[in-house]
Structure formats: C-alpha cells, structure tokens
C-alpha cells in the first residue's frame, strides 16, 4: 500500500466530510485521473473515494422518496442485479470488486443527480474544474508531443502512484502517441473527446458561463482538447470525436461567411498538414499501414468473447474474469479493445441487456431534457468505446455530462453563481 496514495485518499475523505457536495463535484470531474491511481487496499483511488463518498451520502443525504424521481432507476436496478448474480454464480467471487462496481457504475450516478437536482448551482463547480483540468492536460499533451517524452509518468511510476506503470512510447502518424497524465493514450482520448463536447456546448449555449469562466480560457481549453484527440494517435478516438461534433452542426445557424472561413481553413490545413492527414486517412482504409490494433485482432477478441460467454450465456463468468483468466491465457485478449468484450464474458446476456437499457434510458433523457442532436454525443462516445477500451473510465459516467447539460438548459441564469470558492480559475 503506497503511503502517498493513502495520504491523498485521507485528504479527499476529509474534504468530503467538511464540504461533501463541492468535493464530490470536483472528484467527479477528476474521475479519470483518480481512476489511474492506486488507492487503499484492493481498491483504486477513484473506487475508494467513491465508496467513501457514497457512505457519507447514505448517512447524511439519502431519502427513499428520491428514488422515485431518478430517471435511470430501472437500468440501475438491472445493472446491480447483473453484477450480484454474475458474482454469486461465478467460479471466482470478488466481493470487493462487486461493491466497487456497484458504487462506481451505479450509485455515484444517483449521488451526482441528487446533488444537481437539489441545488443546480453546483454545476458551476463541475464545469470550472473541467476547464482547469482541460487546460492542464491540454498544455501538458503539447509539451509531451514536442519533447517526445513524458516526464510526469516517469515520476509517478517511480513513486508507484499509478496502478499500471505503462509509458506509451509508440509512434503513430509520425509522432509519439500522447497519454499526458493518464495511464493510457486512450484514456486521454476519452477525456479529451468528452471535455471538448461538453465545453463546446457550454460555450455555444451558456453566455453567462462563458463570461464568468472567461471566453479566451474556455476557447483555449476546447481547442487543446480537440488537438489532444489527434495527438493520441488513436483512430477510434478521432472517429468518436467526429460523431460527437455532429451534435453541434445545424443548417439553421450556418452563415455563408462561416462556410467560406471553414472552407479556407480546411484547404490551408490540408496544404500545411498534407502528409500527416494522409497517414490518418490511410489508417482508416488500410489498418495494416500503421501499428496497433486492427480488424483481425478485434475479430479474434470477439470470437474469444463469444466462446467464453457460451460457458455461462445468461449470467457470464463473473467480475474480472476477462482480465484475470482470459487475458492471462490468451495474449490476443490483452487490453480487450471494446466496451462489449468484458461485458460479454463477465456478465453475459443479462449484462449486455442492462447496458443496452442504460443507453436507451440515457437516450430518452437526452431527447426529453436536452436536445435531440446530442444523441450524436452519446453515439460518438459509444462508437469510441465500442472500438477501443478506455481504462479508468466507466461508460455509465457519461450520464454526468447530460445531467449537466439538462440542468444548464433549464436553470442557466439561476446557477451561474458557484456555492463555493474553489477551485478558482483566476
């Protein structure tokens, strides 16, 4: 057990006790960074903090009546049932992992929704933290790419702060693949795609937030996140971002001067980055032209997933079976390149059904409370996570972004003032 990680956990736990709601918003925004870190005992940092936060929430703030208004109640129950039954009938039972899965994938979403629904001013804490983190991650991504080295990862690995001591040194599209402060480049890609989408929506729809956060800082953060997606050198991330950005296109608001500027920018971009863009386009049409995963490897992984799923088709083989047994026995399964592969093996048809119901309920929530165009946002992340794994990211946490957007759309003027003074961007 790393003493530095224990100290970080104790500090965060103390902040949760002193100022639960603000701290929970900051922790939620930083979940993918905390998810890379070692924590306490068998739990990673984000898992341990989430369990501590949920315990405090249940003791202080939980009311049974709140369950009735929760929009994801059915899919949450289905996910919990899937986890419990799969673990109970598994060959190897993991009760610690069962608790962390339920808390991180299901309970944390409920806590987040209750905090926002009862005082939507806490949204500003989340957004401000996202802007700060995006600026830090974006700037460091550029530094890492320019110097072709990641000194931060060397330091944290020497201190054994992260659960995986992976330093990505692959070359893709002629440049080192960036991972910034995350354990993997795909985690950086997932974070950058979601932050680009969320902050772009805020910049286009929330003038009060833009003024309070600072237009330049917000624009720089968005630009850095989009650039970071390309610097990861991950095709699935680029494809996911392309779909996410479709959420913001509307013929109704297109003006000829912007069309002209866009055309000129694209032409200049192709002229300046001709070789780089050629490599990206070629990588989609000829996956063997670059290193990394390809269609054959993914096909083998899905064939193996189907094979092991048939051992227990309805309930699956139990939590962590994919990475503790299958990946250990079959090298082709290392870093299972899809959201669906571990679900198929670990949780079977019940788990697949639970995730599909979750996606449908989130889609309905977007249609009812956000904008129907934002279904492309959901689809973009689904495409990305279906093509690649995203370490330190739980797909269900995508719901955070749509809760934020829904309440911003409904209460923007009354929630621009933050109920707390941290963390400051000025």
Residue ranges and their predicted role:
Residues 56, 195-197, 242, 246, ...:
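Transmembrane alpha-helices of multi-pass inner-membrane enzymes
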Residues 12, 127-156, 166-174, 180-232, ...:
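Alpha-helical transmembrane segments of multi-pass inner-membrane proteins
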Residues 203, 212-219, 242-250, 256-260, ...:
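Hydrophobic transmembrane alpha-helices and their immediate junctions
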Residues 10-14, 53-64, 83-146, 358-361, ...:
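Transmembrane alpha-helical segments and their membrane-water interfaces
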Residues 36-38, 276-347:
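Long extracytoplasmic/lumenal interhelical loops at the membrane interface
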Residues 18-39, 48-110, 379-385, 425-426:
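N-terminal hydrophobic segments of proteins, predominantly signal-anchor/transmembrane helices
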Residues 139-149, 232, 249-289, 311:
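A membrane-periplasm/extracellular boundary helix in multi-pass inner-membrane enzymes
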Residues 180, 184-186, 226, 315, ...:
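A conserved mid-to-late transmembrane alpha helix and its immediate loop/hinge
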């Amino acid at each position: 057990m790393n003493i530095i990680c224990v100290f970080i956990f104790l500090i965060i736990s103390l902040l949760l006790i002193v100022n639960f709601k603000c701290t929970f918003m900051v922790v939620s925004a930083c979940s993918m960074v905390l998810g890379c870190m070692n924590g306490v005992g068998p739990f990673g940092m984000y898992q341990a903090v989430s369990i501590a936060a949920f315990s405090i929430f249940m003791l202080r703030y939980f009311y049974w009546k709140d369950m009735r208004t929760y929009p994801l109640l059915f899919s949450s129950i289905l996910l919990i049932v899937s986890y419990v039954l799969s673990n109970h009938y598994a060959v190897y039972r993991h009760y610690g992992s069962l608790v962390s899965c339920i808390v991180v994938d299901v309970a944390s979403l409920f806590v987040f929704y209750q905090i926002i629904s009862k005082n939507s001013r806490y949204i500003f804490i989340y957004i401000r933290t996202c802007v700060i983190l995006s600026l830090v991650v974006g700037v460091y991504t550029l530094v890492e790419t320019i110097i072709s080295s990641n000194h931060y990862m060397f330091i944290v690995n020497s201190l054994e702060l992260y659960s995986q001591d992976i330093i990505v040194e692959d070359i893709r599209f002629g440049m080192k693949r960036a991972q910034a402060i995350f354990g993997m480049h795909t985690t950086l890609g997932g974070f950058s795609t979601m932050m680009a989408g969320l902050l772009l929506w805020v910049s286009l729809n929330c003038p009060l937030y833009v003024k309070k956060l600072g237009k330049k800082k917000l624009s720089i953060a968005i630009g850095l996140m989009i650039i970071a997606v390309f610097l990861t050198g991950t095709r699935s991330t680029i494809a996911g971002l392309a779909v996410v950005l479709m959420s913001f296109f509307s013929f109704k608001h297109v003006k000829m001067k912007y069309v002209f500027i866009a055309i000129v920018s694209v032409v200049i971009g192709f002229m300046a980055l001709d070789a780089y863009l050629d490599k990206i386009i070629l990588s989609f049409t000829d996956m063997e032209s670059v290193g990394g995963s390809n269609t054959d490897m993914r096909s083998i992984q899905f064939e193996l997933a189907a094979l092991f799923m048939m051992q227990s088709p309805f309930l699956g083989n139990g939590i962590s079976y994919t990475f503790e047994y299958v990946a250990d026995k079959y090298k082709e399964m290392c870093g299972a390149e899809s959201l669906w592969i571990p679900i198929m093996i670990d949780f079977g048809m019940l788990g697949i059904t639970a995730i599909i119901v979750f996606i449908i309920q989130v889609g309905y929530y977007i249609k009812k409370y956000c904008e129907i165009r934002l279904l492309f946002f959901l689809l973009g992340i689904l495409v990305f996570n279906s093509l690649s794994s995203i370490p330190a990211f739980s797909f269900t946490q995508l719901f955070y972004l749509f809760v934020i957007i829904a309440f911003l759309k409904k209460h923007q003027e009354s929630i621009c003032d933050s109920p707390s003074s941290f963390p400051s961007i000025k």
